[in-house]
């Protein structure tokens, strides 16, 4: 039997408890677990413990039933047969109504486990508080279900993994570092480059040529390197980003510009 929640979702009765039924157990904790940039050995001891202890492992999925990069990273630590593997398909749209409904749906899926007293570990590559899907998930969970404890478990960022791959310090002494999502806005790119000694452009693949144009304009073309799938078995390093002009890169690509 289907029912409609106050948020407007149609849910199967056996999937979620009725709206007016109180939780019989203490509410579970929602953990945002950073699992590092790609190498499973870069997961922290605490993250490893939580992956083993939490009965529910939530992860971002491109489609229902699909896996994700974060899911692949933790496979060696998680016995999927002994866990509830909760794939969350996040909305990829600019329509505000669909976006809000999609996000609320993912929160309710997590809440269905939490209200039964199950701890949920949401795994995210890198760190949960740096440009992570978990940021919005946690914020909305606290808004809709303020009684849920939310805990962030830090992870190693791809930014730090890239520095290691390049054998290049990000900053020393009084040097300034900027970590910025790459954009087509040339003025924003220039401002970032002019005001920092080292700049890391995240998700650079879609705007690579634009960034290269701005670098050339500022005389910094030879100062940029690109790393894809940092620390994973598929990691690739280009120390001269200029050679990549016109190239289609992996989505998980970042650029490091060191003056």
Please state what every model-predicted region is.
Residues 30, 193-259:
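A contiguous loop/helix-start segment that scaffolds small-molecule binding in enzyme catalytic cores
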Residues 98-106, 165-168, 192-195, 237-244:
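Short, surface-exposed amphipathic charged segments that create phosphate/polyanion-binding patches used
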Residues 37-38, 62-64, 90, 175-184, ...:
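Short, acidic/turn-prone active-site loops that include or flank metal/cofactor-
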Residues 103-112, 169-181, 243-254:
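A polyampholytic, Gly/Pro-enriched intrinsically disordered region
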Residues 85-89, 154, 224-232:
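A generic structural motif
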Residues 1-40, 45-47, 52-149, 212, ...:
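Class I S-adenosyl-L-methionine
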Residues 129-195:
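Class I SAM-dependent methyltransferase SAM-binding "motif I" and its flanking Rossmann-like core
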